[in-house]
């Protein structure tokens, strides 16, 4: 630079530093060249966070040096602040417990989301494995994937309250309606549904308490397929969560007209449907 070689210039660059490191990396993401968001909130809210450069008209000499400032063409605009709903204490707790659970169960990966049940706000979102956005040059690309939003799975028995709610709303059962689960099996065509433990006759309330697959299937089969589908669709199954994060998926809820009886039965306890966290 001291030689004043034409075309060789010095440029000041800035880089974000993320105090939470790998604990919140999948939420915050990171920026790349020229401070442009590449992942997470940094990418999803790039338009809000990024400032707008200004410009001025001036005169420079043949060495590229400014010799006269003539006028301002456009004033620069600073980026705006963005407040998240994350609770830092819960985020650290979620990260710690998820890491421990993945390691204890020798799992390949895991995700954890904590929501405020009243507002729906995300209080914590963690993934393992993770990466440190402050030294991401050493991180494998797969570690940057926000599995809580991009990966889908069958929700299993966590779906039972929704299928039973559909029947309660439709008036086909009441909380105290008896449901015969027999010896804990139910055969539909060539397939047989099993309960972990035979429980005989259960009330609808007990079907949830005991997590009876047979009971949930019988309750669901007492509904028109479209009724069950509508309840699941109304609460958001089969649609993206609309968090604004890049790569989020919607899961899968097939149209009711394509369901076979066994599919309606197994869907009542969370099989044959896919969701993200």
Q: How would you name each of these model-derived features?
A:
Residues 2, 67-110:
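Conserved, well-ordered alpha-helix/loop/beta-strand core segments that scaffold catalytic motifs
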Residues 53, 106-109, 180:
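Short, small/polar residue-rich loop motifs at catalytic or cofactor-binding pockets
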Residues 1-79:
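Small/polar-residue-rich segments within soluble enzyme cores
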Residues 61-73, 86, 112, 116-157, ...:
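Beta-lactam-recognizing serine transpeptidase/beta-lactamase-like catalytic domain environment
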Residues 5, 35, 90, 98-119, ...:
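Flexible, solvent-exposed loop/hinge segments and secondary-structure transition points
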Residues 12-14, 31, 86-90, 98, ...:
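A mature extracytoplasmic/lumenal domain signature
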């Amino acid at each position: 630079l001291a030689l004043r070689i034409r075309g060789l210039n010095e440029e000041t660059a800035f880089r974000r530093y993320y105090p939470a490191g790998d604990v919140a990396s999948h939420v915050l993401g990171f920026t790349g060249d020229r401070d442009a968001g590449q992942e997470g909130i940094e990418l999803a809210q790039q338009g809000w966070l990024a400032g707008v450069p200004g410009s001025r008209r001036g005169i420079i000499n043949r060495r590229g040096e400014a010799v006269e400032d003539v006028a301002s063409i456009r004033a620069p605009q600073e980026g705006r602040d963005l407040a998240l709903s994350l609770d830092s204490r819960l985020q650290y707790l979620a990260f710690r417990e998820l890491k421990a659970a993945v390691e204890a169960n020798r799992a390949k990966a895991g995700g954890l989301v904590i929501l405020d049940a009243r507002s729906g706000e995300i209080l914590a979102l963690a993934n393992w494995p993770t990466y440190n956005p402050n030294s991401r040059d050493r991180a494998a690309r797969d570690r940057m994937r926000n599995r809580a939003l991009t990966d889908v799975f069958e929700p299993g028995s966590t779906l039972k309250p929704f299928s039973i709610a559909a029947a309660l709303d439709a008036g086909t059962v009441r909380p105290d309606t008896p449901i015969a689960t027999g010896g804990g099996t139910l055969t539909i065509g060539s397939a047989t549904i099993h309960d972990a433990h035979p429980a005989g006759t259960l009330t609808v309330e007990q079907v949830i308490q005991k997590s009876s697959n047979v009971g949930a299937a019988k309750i669901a089969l007492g509904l028109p397929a479209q009724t069950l589908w509508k309840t699941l669709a109304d609460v958001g199954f089969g649609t993206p969560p609309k968090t604004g994060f890049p790569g989020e998926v919607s899961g899968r809820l097939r149209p009711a007209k394509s369901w076979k009886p066994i599919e309606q039965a197994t869907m009542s306890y969370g099989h044959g449907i896919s969701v993200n966290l």
